[in-house]
Amino acid sequence: MLRPSLASLSLSVSDTSTKKPIVIHHHNNLTMGGTEKMCQIFLKHFIKDNTFDHYVAYKADGDNTREPYFKEIVGPEKMICYESPAKLLNTIHGLKPFILHRYSAGIPEYPFVSEIKQHTKHFISTSVFGNQDDTIDISKVIYVSKHVQHMAGKTGIPEKGIYYPDHSVVRNPIEAPYSTENLREELGIPDDAFVFGRIGRDDASIYENINIRAYAEVERDDVFLVLVAPSRECRSDVGRFGIKNAKYIERTTDEVRLSKFFNTIDVQAHARKDGECNSGAHYEGFAHRVPLISHYGTTFQGHLETTGGGGFVVLSGDVEEYTRIMKAFIDKEVDYEALSEAAYQQYQKVTDVKMSAAQLNIYKSLL
């Protein structure tokens, strides 16, 4: 893969006549994860604004599946793929960015170090998990939900005069739907069948089977379960619990195909062991008017906040309650239209336009 050299990158910046302030968006890798997708959507909107020049920095080693998408948005000349901290430092020295924005768990980690700060006006941190980095001066901290901000202890107590003006919430921007079509014909699912769906990455450390166990209790000829990117453990559980109407969609980055998945299902049957901070997949379902069933996680409960009236969240391990809700959907004992509309209203709060403007305004506040 050809990448611009650090020397040519620095030269192109010094030769430019626009002299717009530079914002570098840093990820450890450009994976399929929600944090990287969030930044990818943001950048589509940021480049339409003429205030800043936007670059993307990331490590050469590791999973960089989204690299082509970022390259298409900002251009190959603004992709900083580095093999070592020294090489990134050299590039930062040449670019002298106005903002270096780190998207991470929020813990103290590279590139927020003094050597980088000497050549950078402002550090901004998106602390996905609410961790605090007090090792260096950070101008603004962004959280993906109020839940995470609360975990960080930075929500403030206005009635006591306690405020944290440099700590803000900007949720995952949702760009959807991409299609009005579905995958029922392709998957062999009748139009009148009731379909539950689950989407998530293949990661044994966060796998939870409450949804699989509950579905096994309600499955019948006209009820199906569609699983996107199921893990080996998930496939094993499908067989172990005797599920016959499971349909698989392999891992994909195709937004149109993912949109068709959401149009295929009636309810998103979510499960993740550690819970969610602010699930983009939930909001994508809401954008397609798909209600949600989920459960309390071991660590994060941000999905209670983001679900609102668009679904149900059961206690951790409560397969019986999860099953009861699934059955109520199938038997039309819940007001599906009301839940569907409530889900859509949740999505309306986090459209790509609204969230991109919110984050861009944080950058502009530092000018």
Which stretches of residues belong to each language-model region?
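Short hydrophobic beta-strand element within catalytic cores of glycosyltransferases
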Residues: 291-295
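Conserved acidic donor-binding segment of nucleotide-sugar-dependent glycosyltransferases
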Residues: 311-319, 328-334
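Acidic donor-binding loop of glycosyltransferase active sites
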Residues: 260-277, 290
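Nucleotide-activated donor-binding/catalytic signature segment of Leloir-type glycosyltransferases, i.e.
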Residues: 74-78, 235-256
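Conserved donor-binding/catalytic core segment of Leloir-type glycosyltransferases
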Residues: 24-26, 190-206, 212-215, 226
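N-terminal strand-loop element at the rim of the active site
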Residues: 26-33, 37-87, 230-234
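A short helix/loop element that forms part of the nucleotide-sugar donor recognition site in Leloir-type
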Residues: 176-189, 358
